[in-house]
Regions:
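Extended, highly charged
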Residues: 1-152
Length: 153
């Protein structure tokens, strides 16, 4: 990825018109799951979503579909959004040999702003957890990016 952190990537998506910020109040369930499933159906060019007003949480934000379209994937690589898919894959392969990279330690990392300490921590009180699909056995904190292809295509 061409960015040092999620914040700078989200800013790049916003600058390219690929981040839809939603400030209306939503419920973690079912609204966030419905939004996640809807973005998958939009098709080519679906934006990333940012929710910052989640019922029951004072300072929680959720972002999803950050690399759920080829435009967003291109932006994540620091390429123009209209970069052809083959060129994106070629660029990804070219960069592969540079990984893994050594972690960079910082005196005051940005994630420290959102740290909770203690012995009695309940994630349901802190995070707007939601199930993505009916029948999910539990709640997911993240979901990986998977670029795949049908072997018969």
């Amino acid at each position: 990825m061409a960015f040092d952190d999620l914040r700078s990537f989200l800013q790049a998506l916003d600058d390219q018109g690929q981040l839809l910020k939603i400030s209306e109040e939503v419920n973690a369930e079912p609204d966030l799951a419905a939004a996640a499933n809807a973005t998958g159906r939009i098709g080519d060019g679906a934006p990333a979503l940012w929710f910052d007003n989640i019922r029951g949480f004072n300072d929680a934000r959720v972002t999803m579909n950050t690399i759920g379209s080829w435009q967003n994937h291109a932006i994540s690589l620091g390429l123009p959004p209209n970069t052809p898919v083959k060129k994106q894959i070629d660029e990804f392969i070219r960069r592969w040999d540079n990984f893994p990279v050594t972690p960079e330690r910082r005196a005051n990392p940005a994630w420290e702003e959102n740290t909770v300490d203690g012995d009695d921590i309940n994630l349901f009180d802190i995070l707007p957890l939601f199930r993505l699909n009916d029948g999910d056995g539990g709640f997911y904190l993240d979901k990986a990016c998977v670029v795949s292809r049908d072997p018969l295509d």
